[in-house]
Regions:
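BZIP DNA-binding basic region
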Residues: 28, 34-37, 47-48
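Acidic-basic catalytic patches of nuclease active cores, encompassing PD-(D/E)XK
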Residues: 1, 17-26, 43-86
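Non-catalytic C-terminal interaction segments of nucleic acid-processing enzymes
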Residues: 1-10, 16-20, 24, 140-175
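Mg2+/Mn2+-dependent nuclease catalytic core
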Residues: 109-140, 144
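Short Cys/His-rich "knuckle" micro-motifs
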Residues: 33-38, 56, 60
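Active-site metal-binding core of divalent-cation-utilizing nuclease and nuclease-like domains
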Residues: 13-17, 31-35, 68-118, 145-146, ...
Length: 175
């Protein structure tokens, strides 16, 4: 997670933290550890074995992506639009990016079909449009994804697309 709350409940980005201050999870209120090493992406983390109330943080419906690919895309948006907390009943989730009434999700890792459906339905039930941006570079490198120029754009062909897209309605943008 890239954002936490300080003692005054202000939203703070990991790169704006100070070592002498405590930061808290915006979902469950638990104290967080700042991870600002030289190897991995800077981020906040719960203390070991803590179970957060953020519905998808604990892998319950697929955990969060901290890949460089994901963070590069997310960082193209203003911080105020990144990792926005959304709630529907007991379900809590942070959208990668929220602009107006549109959620943008960046997906680098493999995602189970149920997790994809759950997230789409969650956003739809809140009245948001969802745009997914998938990292398909691995599929391109093995020939599963091809493209050719057509008119003023590109025509893509995806051999054996994931079954998560079988029930996707292009017109409505819903599952």
């Amino acid at each position: 997670m890239l954002f936490a709350s300080d003692f005054e409940d202000n939203r703070v980005h990991i790169d704006d933290t100070h070592s002498n201050q405590e930061y808290y999870c915006p979902y469950c209120g638990a104290p967080l550890v700042t991870k600002k090493g030289d190897i991995r992406q800077h981020h906040f983390a719960h203390k070991q074995s803590h179970v957060c109330s953020d519905t998808w943080a604990n892998g319950g419906s697929h955990g969060y992506d901290l890949s460089p690919w994901h963070n590069e895309w997310q960082s193209l948006f203003p911080k105020v639009n990144q990792e926005v907390k959304l709630c529907l009943g007991e379900t809590k989730h942070r959208a990668d990016v929220l602009v107006d009434r549109t959620v943008i999700e960046f997906q680098h890792s493999i995602m189970p079909v149920k997790a994809f459906d759950d997230r789409n339905n969650f956003y739809f039930n809140l009245g948001y449009k969802v745009i997914w941006l998938f990292d398909l570079s691995d599929l391109y490198s093995i020939g599963q994804l091809t493209y050719k120029p057509i008119n003023n754009g590109l025509f893509f062909t995806w051999k054996n697309p994931k079954k998560a897209f079988n029930n996707y309605d292009i017109q409505s943008g819903c599952i």
